[in-house]
């Protein structure tokens, strides 16, 4: 396990939502690309968008996971390597996989890539976890039906990093095992094309138009302490097809209660409901096998009265140290967290007329413009009789910020 209580894992159906959930407090984001994802009808990321997403997230210390969570035909395997290679080189943090053959192939193709098994793999016990570990799996996403007591036992017996769904839609059947949509309409959930027939009304014993297969949405925000005690590391929010306000709002509330460790207020719980729900919430799977109170019965539609404001883009705070001494190369060292970068210019010359003013130099360095950064503090060591042109100071700032940006983003697999 890593040195933090939880990873808050958020969905993103497009680049705008990805940026929004990161600004709202997500530790990691999962997305779908142009192939092999379980949301074939979503507006999935293009290659260009996904590469931008990886850079945006990594600059902020956030991880990106790519869904490869459908069953893949033999004829499609030849496309898998080329599809993933560009993201692997960019530093994609992990793939989320359903097909055991794909797990084996990715581990062979990209041995340093983390592999997370999808909930579509229906892992419900320690034996399944042990089986998967031999193929390089680094995290297992628990089936939604697994209780907290079972998760605790699985974690204690295997030591595997566990991820559990904490919020969002529930399937009536085990994810990855349901053929209802395939049989009824020829659209396979295992190929990302589920038609959701469980959300339709049915006649049972003469009773018409009852939604007997439509489950309420999950909400586990009141069980965070119990999830922690069960050994769950990653808390997954469902919703790659949800809107910006929903995704950002849910992330904001979970972020607040993960960090504060306070009991969830009734007012906030009601506000989370307003963001979106199906006839209320349930967390019964955490504690019981099932129950009739999990079913919506009267209406299956997702109701949202989202009124949460979209998060504003925040600048990333950095520190700077400016050194300008006569006869020595001028330098600007910038630091964010434990990442530093030093940029230099030609040796500083003596002033022929008016020497460089210290405040003016600091003000010049402070002009970060439309970059992602802003200085929280600049320490300056400037000689008494030196001169540096504004253009050189601008270049020093640009080079330092660009270098820090490249270093922060990194290239994890090359």
Regions flagged by a language model, labelled:
Residues 1-24, 28-39, 53-54, 60-88, ...:
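Surface-exposed amphipathic alpha-helical tracts and adjacent flexible/coil segments at the periphery
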Residues 105:
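Basic, amphipathic alpha-helical recognition segments used for DNA target recognition
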Residues 122:
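Beta/alpha (TIM)-barrel catalytic core signal, keyed to glycine-rich beta->alpha loops juxtaposed to Asp/Glu
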Residues 42-51:
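Aromatic- and glycine-enriched glycan-recognition loops and surfaces
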Residues 119:
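Residues at the C-termini of beta-strands that transition into short coil/loop
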Residues 126-127:
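Conserved nucleotide-cofactor-binding alpha/beta core module
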């Amino acid at each position: 396990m890593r040195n933090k209580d939880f990873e808050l894992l958020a969905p993103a159906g497009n680049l705008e939502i990805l940026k929004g959930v990161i600004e709202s407090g997500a530790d990691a984001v999962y997305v779908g690309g142009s192939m092999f994802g379980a949301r074939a009808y979503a507006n999935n990321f293009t290659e260009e968008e996904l590469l931008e997403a990886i850079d945006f997230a990594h600059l902020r210390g956030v991880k990106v996971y790519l869904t490869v969570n459908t069953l893949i035909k033999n004829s499609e395997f030849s496309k898998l390597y080329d599809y993933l290679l560009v993201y692997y080189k960019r530093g994609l943090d992990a793939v989320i996989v359903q097909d055991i053959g794909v797990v084996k192939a990715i581990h062979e193709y990209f041995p340093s890539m983390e592999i997370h098994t999808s909930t579509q793999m229906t892992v419900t016990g320690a034996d399944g976890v042990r089986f998967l570990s031999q193929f390089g799996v680094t995290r297992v996403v628990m089936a939604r039906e697994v209780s907290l007591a079972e998760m605790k036992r699985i974690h204690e017996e295997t030591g595997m990093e566990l991820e559990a769904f904490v919020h969002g839609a529930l399937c009536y059947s085990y994810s990855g095992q349901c053929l209802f949509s395939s049989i009824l309409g020829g659209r396979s959930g295992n190929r990302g094309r589920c038609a959701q027939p469980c959300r339709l009304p049915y006649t049972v014993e003469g009773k018409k138009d009852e939604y007997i297969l439509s489950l309420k949405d999950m909400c586990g925000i009141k069980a965070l302490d119990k999830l922690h005690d069960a050994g769950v590391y990653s808390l997954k929010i469902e919703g790659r097809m949800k809107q910006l306000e929903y995704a950002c709002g849910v992330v904001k509330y979970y972020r607040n209660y993960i960090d504060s460790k306070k009991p969830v207020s009734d007012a906030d719980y009601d506000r989370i409901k307003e963001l979106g729900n199906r006839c209320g919430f349930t967390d019964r799977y955490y504690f019981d096998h099932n129950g009739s109170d999990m079913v919506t019965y009267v209406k299956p539609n997702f109701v949202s009265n989202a009124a949460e404001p979209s998060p504003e883009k925040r600048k990333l705070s950095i520190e700077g140290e400016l050194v300008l001494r006569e006869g020595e190369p001028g330098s600007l060292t910038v630091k964010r967290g434990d990442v530093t970068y030093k940029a230099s210019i030609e040796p500083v010359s003596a002033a022929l007329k008016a020497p460089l003013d210290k405040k003016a130099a600091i003000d010049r360095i402070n002009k970060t413009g439309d970059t992602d950064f802003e200085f929280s503090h600049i320490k300056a060591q400037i000689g008494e009789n030196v001169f540096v042109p504004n253009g050189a100071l601008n270049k020093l700032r640009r080079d330092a910020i660009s270098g820090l940006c490249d270093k922060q983003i990194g290239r994890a697999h090359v």
